[in-house]
Each structure stands twice: as C-alpha cells, then as structure tokens.
From Swiss-Prot:
Broad enzyme group: oxidoreductase
Localization annotation: Nucleus; Cytoplasm
Origin species: Rattus norvegicus (Rat)
Annotated residues for binding of 2-oxoglutarate: 205
Tissue: Highly expressed in vascular smooth muscle. Moderately expressed in esophagus, stomach, small bowel and aorta. Low levels in tail and kidney. Expression also in pheochromocytoma cell line PC-12.
A GO BP annotation: regulation of neuron apoptotic process
Record bears the keyword Flavoprotein: no
PTM note: Ubiquitinated by SIAH1 and/or SIAH2 in response to the unfolded protein response (UPR), leading to its degradation.
Molecular function per GO: 2-oxoglutarate-dependent dioxygenase activity; ferrous iron binding; hypoxia-inducible factor-proline dioxygenase activity; L-ascorbic acid binding; peptidyl-proline 4-dioxygenase activity; peptidyl-proline dioxygenase activity
Fe2OG dioxygenase domain sequence ranges: 116-214
GO cellular component annotations of the record: cytoplasm; nucleus
Listed name of the protein: Prolyl hydroxylase EGLN3
Cofactor: Fe(2+); L-ascorbate
The keyword ATP-binding belongs to this UniProt entry's keyword annotation: no
Gene: Egln3
Length: 239
C-alpha cells in the first residue's frame, strides 16, 4: 500500500480503513513507503551505527529453552531501544507514528485493550544463511497482541538475498511471503494465529520490531511470573 510523503499521511484513515479490516480478515497487513526516503534513511543509519559499534547481541530463545542461544534456530543479533537515547530521534519519530496508528485502531481490535508496548527490538541477520525457524511470538499468553515490524533493507532481492518472512495464517489455505524491503511496516497478530519464520538470509538484513500489550493479559502474565518467582525462591530457601 504506497503512502506517499509522511506529511500527507492520514493515520486515522489508514488505521480504520486498512489496518483494522486486514487484521480481522487475514491477520496481517503492511504499509510501504511509510516514512519516506529521508526519514527512513535516518533510521537505517542509526541502526547501522548500533550494529557497527557492537551494540547487538545474539537473540535468545523463549519457552523451555529460555535464555539459550541456538544459532541454527535463531540467527539474529539484537538490541533494545527506547527511542529517547542520544542519536535515536528518527527512531523515536517512527515509534510515535506506530503508536498513533495502534491508538487509532483502538476498540476495533476486538477484545484487546492496549495501554503499553515493548521497547523496539533492533535486529540484524548478518547473512551467511542465518534465519529464524517457524515460531509464534506469543504462544502462552504473555500479553503481546500486536506485532509491528519495520524493515530497513535497500535494494533487497529476495531471489538473491532470501530473508523472506513467511507467515502461516491459522485456518487459511495459503502462506504469505513478506519481503523485508526498505521502509515497509508490517502489522500482525502476535498469538497462535500467525506462526511465521524468517527464511535464511544471504545478505545483512535489518528490522525493528515492537509489540503492543493487551492490558488484562499482560497483568495476568506478570502476576503468574511473580507467583512463580516466589515459589522458586521459597523452594530454594528450603534447600
């Protein structure tokens, strides 16, 4: 969906007439040319600086192998950005626009009530066939309901470079291949409706992801975590 210059964006219209219907009908959608060349370049340059300065670390697996680095399963390198850090003005601007889009979606997202989101996860697949095996962002009710990914890869040719995000929409007879091209913004449900994988990348591949939380599910997840922590500490104390 080409959007043109950022100053002409009608974010509310995009949210209500495009994002909301697409999420409910197919579970995902994307916007192309979201920031425009100039602002998108500023985001890309900052991400490259983070990469070249050694700020990125191997991505970790969640679930039963939480905290474990398995490069053959997940090959990205990541760091977390709030947007207020020095030199991250363009990233902060991007995040503010995504926030507004999600805000405009509002109650039309169904059962979800979004009050907060994660920091931005800056990710780099360094090439050499690195990818991320099929998985679900939120399989166990941790509160994440919407995944937003902003891609930063100029002159990307999926036939040469790979790196396609393949989505396996639940209950659908098709798969969806999303190429990680520069200035593309993807929205999708975070739960089991959208299993997905990052196919092997043969060139440096950059992306930035934020997750929006449903307030009730997030509060319940935090409560369960606190209870588990207390039980673990109590068991260790008895030993």
């Amino acid at each position: 969906m080409p959007l043109g210059h950022i100053m002409r964006l009608d974010l509310e219209k995009i949210a209500l007439e495009y994002i909301v219907p697409c999420l409910h009908e197919v579970g995902f959608c994307y916007l192309d040319n979201f920031l425009g060349e100039v602002v998108g370049d500023c985001v890309l340059e900052r991400v490259k600086q983070l990469h070249y300065n050694g700020a990125l670390r191997d991505g970790q697996l969640a679930g039963p192998r939480a905290g474990v680095s398995k490069r053959h399963l997940r090959g990205d390198q990541i760091t977390w950005i709030g947007g207020n850090e020095e030199g991250c003005e363009a990233i902060n601007f991007l995040l503010s626009l995504i926030d507004r889009l999600v805000l405009y979606c509002g109650s039309r997202l169904g059962k979800y009530y979004v009050k907060e989101r994660s920091k931005a996860m800056v990710a780099c697949y360094p090439g050499n066939g690195t990818g991320y095996v099929r998985h679900v962002d939120n399989p166990n009710g941790d509160g994440r309901c919407i995944t937003c990914i902003y891609y930063l890869n100029k002159n990307w040719d999926a036939k040469l470079h790979g790196g396609v995000l393949r989505i396996f929409p639940e209950g659908k007879s098709f798969v969806a291949d999303v190429e990680p091209i520069f200035d593309r913004l993807l929205f999708s449900w975070s739960d089991r409706r959208n299993p997905h994988e990052v196919q092997p990348s043969y060139a440096t591949r950059y992306a930035m992801t934020v997750w929006y939380f449903d307030a009730e599910e997030r509060a319940e997840a935090k409560k369960k975590f606190r209870n588990l922590t207390r039980k673990t500490e109590s068991a260790l104390a008895k030993d």
